[in-house]
A protein has these predicted regions:
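Cap/lid and interdomain-hinge subdomains that line or gate substrate/regulatory clefts
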Residues: 45-47, 104, 109-244
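Extended hydrophobic packing segments that form well-structured cores
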Residues: 376-498
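Short, well-structured alpha-helical segments in soluble
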Residues: 60-73, 90-92, 260-269
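Periplasmic-binding protein-like
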Residues: 73-83, 101-103, 272-277
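Short beta-strand segments enriched in small/hydrophobic residues
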Residues: 3-26, 175-184
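Long, internal scaffold/assembly segments composed of regular secondary structure
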Residues: 232, 236-324
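C-terminal catalytic subdomain
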Residues: 300-425
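Short catalytic helix/loop segments, enriched in acidic residues and glycine
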Residues: 25-41
Length: 498
């Protein structure tokens, strides 16, 4: 389900014909070597493709338009090896519509003190060539990422790799389609939002379907398919009967297996990559989807509870951005539930009624069947686990009425002090940066929701870059946050983002 296009990124080097064929040949040789070496590092998540040196207005414009037309091109990385008069770039930049990086580097790492002469100076002019180019991009108010450093530095390569994932998120955002099989929870404000504006800003298509239409897809799943999936569950997860009759327990598990298969087939048939449900609108469904939704999230689908389509789209987006990542720790919807306010042990218990993605799990994953007061249906089965320790980010996309705001909080996930044997749901426990009190105050001042799209594998910088590309405000809550400054930033955002 996380399959995307076989994306590539173009590496475009700027120069001009003033320097002659010998110099331009070296420019091409150097840029090819940089591309080859970057691809060999194994750090980049996508292939970098070398393009011939751009030396004229016509060639620049042609190359950028070819990048626009190439469905596999997810972005262009530009670098000025020599001086490249920036007026030559205006038309190409005006017509370019994909993510852009300005890589401010140079071929040589060190000044060749003993041999440097004017030929070398003319050939290696990134220090001022990139400033000329940077000026025109800034003057044109074009959003781009700037990465500075030598191309052989693994830290610098890591920054390029990180941006590539953001760029793919930017590209894939316009392909996200969210299926609403339930409306927003009655009287809840923060999960509401302008779906038309979301499609204009982010490219998201958010559509409603009657819950009984997807329930028919569930009912159409054969007993043999359902039983095969139940067998898979029993092989993969621990089964915690907790005194329930084994056959009765298995029937409850089978309901979720049937929901998983029916939902997935319906989503694939209708071409949707995210879904929202609501315990108050279950139609003919026998249980609130729990284990089924958890499994769909694990496959890469986005999910939002109680009609929260913004979280569903954000979870899908963040799963796309982390696709194929080595040693990924996971991405999920989470919800702020309750605090631990004991001094020195502060934190927020994260959970939901059922639907937390098992990609964030550490240790055993169990199936439990417990009553649920909401929904007025059978006791639903769900996967129960505790989340990994480590650093992550919690994001909340909110609608302020006239615009969107993305709130990004760095958090530290920890082990809970004690087990919670009577709590039959998956949980995480984190302390927001810079501390619980400042983090929670800033979150509330910014208008953040109780539902979040959370990931161990993305950074605040990556999500902020995505927000900038979408033309919306991003506010950061991190180790440096001070409430007085944060409130000032919110006031400035009100003026700038209109």
């Amino acid at each position: 389900m996380l399959q995307t296009k076989n994306y590539k990124f173009w590496f475009c080097t700027g120069s001009q014909d003033l320097y002659g064929d010998e110099c331009l040949a070296k420019v091409a040789q150097h840029s090819k070597q940089i591309v080859d070496e970057l691809n060999k590092t194994g750090i980049l998540p996508y292939e970098l493709v070398w393009k011939p040196t751009l030396i004229t207005n016509e060639l620049i414009r042609k190359t950028f338009n070819e990048a626009n037309a190439d469905e596999e091109c997810a972005g262009v990385i530009t670098w000025m090896h020599t001086f490249s008069p920036a007026k030559s770039w205006i038309l190409g930049l005006q017509e370019y519509r994909k993510p852009l990086m300005h890589f401010h580097t140079q071929f040589n790492e060190e000044i060749p003190y003993d041999s440097i002469d004017m030929d070398f100076m003319n050939e290696n002019q990134s220090a001022h060539g990139d400033r000329e180019y940077g000026h025109i991009v800034s003057r044109m108010r074009i959003e781009r990422k700037v990465v500075v450093g030598h191309w052989s530095d693994s830290v610098v390569v890591g920054k390029i790799a990180s941006w590539m994932r953001t760029a793919v998120g930017i590209m894939e955002s316009s392909h996200i389609r969210v299926m609403r099989v339930a409306d927003n929870m009655r009287n809840v404000a923060v999960t509401e939002g302008d779906k038309v504006e979301a499609q204009i800003k982010f490219g998201w298509e958010v559509d409603a379907y009657p819950v009984n239409e997807i329930a028919e897809s569930v009912a159409a799943v054969s007993a043999s398919d359902t039983n095969a999936l139940v067998d898979e569950y029993y092989d993969k997860y621990e089964i915690l009967l907790e005194g329930r009759d084994p056959e009765e327990f298995k029937k409850h598990v089978a309901v979720q297996a049937q929901i998983e298969l029916g939902f997935e087939r319906f989503l694939e048939e209708k071409n949707y990559q995210a879904i929202v449900t609501h315990f108050g609108d279950l139609g003919a469904l026998k249980q609130l989807p729990g284990l089924a939704i958890q499994r769909l999230m694990e496959k890469g689908y986005g999910f939002g509870a109680e009609g929260d389509w913004k979280v569903a789209a954000m979870v899908r987006l963040m799963k796309i951005m982390t696709a194929g990542m080595k040693d990924a720790k996971g991405t999920s919807m989470l919800e702020d539930y309750t605090y631990n306010l004991v001094k020195g042990k502060e934190g927020i218990l994260q959970a939901h009624m059922l639907e937390i993605c098992p990609t964030i799990a550490e240790g055993p994953i169990s199936i439990k069947c417990q009553p649920l007061s909401m929904g007025d249906r059978e006791d639903p089965t769900r996967l129960v686990f505790t989340a990994k320790e480590g650093h992550g980010i919690a994001t909340s996309l909110i609608d302020l009425g006239n615009r969107f705001r993305l709130i990004i909080n760095d958090v530290e996930c920890k082990k809970t002090e004690k087990d919670m044997p009577k709590l039959p749901v998956a949980t995480a426990f984190w302390t927001p940066e810079p501390d619980l009190y400042t983090g929670a105050e800033a979150w509330i001042l910014a208008g953040g929701a109780h539902h979040t799209a959370f990931s161990y594998d993305l950074t605040a910088e990556q999500m902020g870059d995505w927000a900038s590309a979408m033309g919306i405000e991003a506010v950061y809550i991190d180790k440096d946050t001070k409430i007085r400054d944060f409130k000032r930033d919110l006031m400035l955002g009100e003026v700038f983002y209109r």
